[in-house]
Amino acid sequence: MSQAAKFRELLASRKMIVAPGAIDGLTGRLIDQAGFPAAYMTGAGTSMTLGYPDYGLITMTEMVANATRIVNSISMPLISDSDTGYGNELNVFRTVQEFERVGVAAIHIEDQVFPKKCGHLDSKELVSREDYIAKIRAAAAARKSKDFCIIARTDSRAVVGFEEAIERANSALANGADIAFVEAPQTMAEVEAVPKRVKGPCLLNVVRGGKTPEIELADAERMGYAIAILPGLLLGGIISVCDQLLADVKRDGKQPPVVSGLPGKTFARFGAAIWDERRTAFRDVIKVAAE
């Protein structure tokens, strides 16, 4: 069964899918080992691993390459950010083909102008509703398998208001999207209203310190959200821990005791035993042939 088909099964279960954000194969593997049903490739995290802010500076090729590394490191479905689709509806068509080809289960496409910026920043700009819907229709037409999910993200709440966000979400669902993603609702009343007023499954972006009020995952599920992504969960933790470790070493001149040893057990978590078995098997074949 494809990961896209597995993702469809998760959606059909009516249990909210919680997908922490992965920025690379390492964090994807950790999410998998922690037992989550899906992972989410964050565009912000991908940008930051390349040394850039979330300002739309990363190309489609770079995003697909990172998604490929994560897909190859996990055993569960990957939802991926695909920003604006990297151009107009023709670019979106190719974007869908590329993400689907490497085994991603679902992508979200947004209605910001290109280049975009993080959905929880100010001064965003939107394309027209007509241009947005053209992209969604192109995305739905481009996929080879109907299991591959198109998530329609709208950033219109911050630019033209909540009502336009609801209208764009419903229009996207009516034109081929499978899931709606109203980015950055600004009050708890708006958070609760989205799954009530949108005519299809809804995704909630859980961003600490962003425009949306903090919410417990159980409350999001009670409100009716189908998916909750946590893009900054590991990214924020990595930055905080790295800053602290670097400060400790600079101050004390030695590694703190909390640092895990390498290689040993750490490599084992990333498949060392499997690769050892393969090498032994290949060499055993040579020995048998020589005899």
Where are these regions (language model features)?
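Alpha/beta enzyme core
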Residues: 2-233, 237, 244-247, 282-291
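Flexible C-terminal active-site loop/helix
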Residues: 249-291
